[in-house]
Structure formats: structure tokens, C-alpha cells
Amino acid sequence: MRPAQASIDLEALRHNYRLARRLGGSKALAVVKADAYGHGAVRCAQALEPEADGFAVACIEEALELRQAGIRAPILLLEGFFEHDELRLIAEHDLWTVAATQQQVRALAEFQSPRPLRVWLKMDSGMHRLGLSPEDFRAAWLRLRGLPQIASLVLMTHLARADELDCSRTDEQAVAFALTAGGMRAETSLRNSPGLLGWPALRNDWSRPGLMLYGANPFPQHTENTAQLRPVMTLRSRIISVRELPAGEPVGYGARFVAERPTRVGVVAMGYADGYPQFAPNGTPVLVDGQICPLIGRVSMDMLTVDLTDHPQADIGTPVQLWGDAPQVSALAAQCNVSAYQLLCGLKRVPRIYVGEAAVGKLSA
């Protein structure tokens, strides 16, 4: 079997969720959209369900996957519904939905639901992606709040630049949201992962941790709070070939690396088709049996190459760690000019194995 695999530590996931709840001082929806950021939505939700206040996904397909796997906790559709027919499924499967457009508000007002729906009304406070204008937001709240098909309303917005700790935009968004939502008797939801980790003055009834659940730092630097995160995914493989090159010889496509000295080259079974960044530069750290070795040459579809010259003990079969506790996925992403979100969500064919107390408990249940 090809040695590439992603190890998912479910106890670390639970630790990060508890941290999110503690930092928020509120209820927290665990965001498991995009297959839990590449970690496996069903297994992650199963691990978190005993203590999670609920989950959040992008669309009804992701929600139904969780329901079919036996997840009974609340599930919020972050993009709401795309067709009116989905409202029947939302009611049937007891899902919560965001309403972020006039069309969604109108459809909810006209829907004859077999059971009252829980709706999260979204205001655009400055991100300018989804959400109602402040005027339409208040009008929608007035329209929906007394309808028999609406069980409850939560007022929400989304922070656009909370991962920039020196940016005033987050405070401006929070003030705009508070000015509009003030006086509306409803729970609120404002804080995402960077909002929880970096903006302690913000307050809400529901937070929505996503990236932090998986142990990735949303900031370019570490803080007291991010230091408490535990990486959930460890991406591993092994060396599958070793060769000696004389000085002056190139490595890989395009000869991006040329040996300046006699160089011992290790080939690792991991490439961009697996989700490793294709344009990782020469020198990107790779952990070979606990020792950092530099990436050399261009990353191929199925393989990458590392300089083993200073690690003579490494040989075919030696274990390799691409990210995890070291190097951390956020640091690797920054070095490769991509986001940690992109790396985690980009794992396509790497098999996942689950470890940690939650995995043991689930298997023995």
C-alpha cells in the first residue's frame, strides 16, 4: 500500500472545541463544512456530538450526510437554501437555516411548514458577500418574528478581517451589527475562529469555530490563545527512493534545484495530487524521522524530493511528516503563499486514519 496517510486525532479535535467554548463564553456550533475541512465530517461530528451545541455546514447535502450517519444535534445551513423545495427537507430533518437574501426571507414567510423552523437571519455588516443590508435586516426580523412557521430567530453576521489583529474593520463591523441588532430580542452570533482567538471583547450567544477546531492558527503569528491549539491532522508518508547526485546536477521538473554540492536525494510518496502545495519553494521544511530536511525541486503530482545530505541515517522506508505538530500547517501555508484552509480541504486521495480517545470510544460503542 502507498504509505501516504492523514492521521486525525479526535481527542485533539475535542480539546480545540472546548477551547472555543471557553474563549467564547457561549454556545458554539462546530463548523464541519467541506468534509470538516478535509478531516471527515461524519467521524468528526460523531466525536464532537456528546458535547457540541450543534454543527454548521455549507449546504443541505452536507447536513443530510450527517443526519444519515445518525447525528441528531442541531445542524445549521450556513448558505441557507437554494431552492424552495429544500424547505421541506429542512423541516423534515429538523435543520436550522440561514436567511441571507430577500428571496430566502420571502420563501420562509410563504412556506407552510409542518413544524416551526429555526432561522438565523444574516446581516451584511461589511464583508459584502452574503447578508441583508441593515435596513432590510430589521425589516426581515419584523416580518418573520411573529410567524407561526418560525420557531426562533438568531441574528448573525460574519467578520471579514478578524485574522488581522491590528485592523479596525472588525470593531467597525461589531459596532454596525450591535447598532442594528440592538433592541431586537434575539440571540446573536458574531465570532468565527479568529474572532474567538483574537478579539476577546466581542460578545455573542453563539460562536462558529471552524479552522481553530482543526488546530490551525488563523494569524500570521502565535498568540497566547493560539498556543493552546492542538493540530488534529498529521500528514505522513515515507521515503521510497534514495540517490546520490554530484554537484551541478538538477532535480525534478524544470531543474528548479541544482545541487551545489554532492547531494543525497530522498523521494517521498507525496505530491500535489495528494494535497501538498505544488509550488512549495526550495527549502520548505519536511520532517524526516524527526529531523528537518529541506524540500528540493518542484513538487510532482505523486512525489516530492528532499535533501538528505545531513541526515545520513534516512533511507528507503524512513517515515516523513509533511505537516502536523511540525511543521505546522499554518506555517507551511504561509511559506507557500496559500491558506491553511486550502491545504486542509485539498486532500483528495490520502486515506485517513482516526486516533485519540474519541476514536477508541466510538469503535468500542
UniProtKB/Swiss-Prot annotation:
Q: Which UniProt keywords apply?
A: Isomerase, Pyridoxal phosphate
Tell me what reaction this enzyme catalyses: L-alanine = D-alanine
**PROSITE patterns annotated for this entry?**
ALANINE_RACEMASE
Query: Catalytic center at which residues?
Result: K33, Y253
Required co-factor(s) are:
pyridoxal 5'-phosphate
Q: Which InterPro entries match?
A: Ala_racemase, Ala_racemase/Decarboxylase_C, Ala_racemase_C, Ala_racemase_N, Ala_racemase_pyridoxalP-BS, PLP-binding_barrel
Give the residue spans that cross the bilayer.
none
Q: Which SMART domains match?
A: Ala_racemase_C (SM01005)
Gene3D superfamilies given in the database record: Alanine racemase, Lyase, Ornithine Decarboxylase, Chain A, domain 1
Tell me the residue numbers annotated for binding substrate.
Answer: R129, M301
- Pfam families associated with the record: Ala_racemase_C, Ala_racemase_N
Give the EC number: 5.1.1.1
Gene Ontology biological process terms, A to Z: D-alanine biosynthetic process
The GO terms describing molecular function are: alanine racemase activity; pyridoxal phosphate binding
Origin, by domain of life? Bacteria
Q: Which residues carry this modification: N6-(pyridoxal phosphate)lysine?
A: K33
Gene Ontology cellular component annotations, sorted alphabetically: cytosol
What pathway, per the record? Amino-acid biosynthesis; D-alanine biosynthesis; D-alanine from L-alanine: step 1/1
Function field:
Catalyzes the interconversion of L-alanine and D-alanine. May also act on other amino acids.
Q: Which family does it belong to?
A: Belongs to the alanine racemase family.
What name does this protein carry?
Alanine racemase
From what organism does this protein derive?
Answer: Xanthomonas euvesicatoria pv. vesicatoria (strain 85-10) (Xanthomonas campestris pv. vesicatoria)
